[in-house]
Amino acid sequence: MKVAFWSSVRGKSCVTSNLACMGILASLDSANRQRKTILFENHHNLMNLESSLFSEFSKDQVREECQYEGYRGMEEVLYAVEKGHIYSSREIFQNARGCLGEKLFYLPQKREGNPDIFEYRMSRDCQAVLQYLERYNDLVMIDTSCSFLNSSRRILEEADLVVVNLFQNEAALSHFFSNYSNIRKKAFYLIGNYEGDSCMTRGEILKRYRIPGSHL
């Protein structure tokens, strides 16, 4: 199953931290030791999933010490897809960082990589990459950029479920619910940084935009 985490507003809805938490919960909740979840993002950002899951310094981050060398991450997966190589599950997971008893994996990006080249390759091969990862994982979870990237558009199209991280701002909410009807058909909603004193409470959002209570 492919699950995209996304927001229409940059930097306000805690998309990355929400995805990291949900990935961990999905892995811990699984009684099946063979069940695997893999995470990645389609954009470059210093505050990424890797910093949330594997930070060695912050006590506020969920983390686990790991010592893995030699992985090339998402670039290696893109290369395999580009060349038509068929990797085994072992080869896929060798390019990822694993934790939680090898049930949760993260595909990193090269920190010194060119973001424009990465976006071009991800946009071109997005469908094949997702199919590739889904072959060996029960859950593929993507931190999807809110920027107007072609790869973001394609990921949102390919995802089985889109977790929309809402920002409690009336204008931002109105813009989303007026312009993204294609996403709403397969959306589940989170309020990433909930403010109890906001006029746009959970109840108000449910009522105004006619969202089923089980979807927020």
Please tell me what each predicted stretch does.
Residues 2, 37-39, 104-106, 213-216:
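Conserved beta-strand scaffold positions in the cores of enzyme catalytic domains, especially
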Residues 5-8, 40, 107, 165, ...:
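Short hydrophobic segments within beta-strands
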Residues 121-215:
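Conserved catalytic-core segment of NTP-binding enzymes
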Residues 9, 43, 110, 145, ...:
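Anionic group-transfer/hydrolysis microenvironments
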Residues 39-131:
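P-loop/Walker-type NTP enzyme "switch/lid" segment
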Residues 14-15, 118, 172:
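Secondary-structure boundary/capping motif
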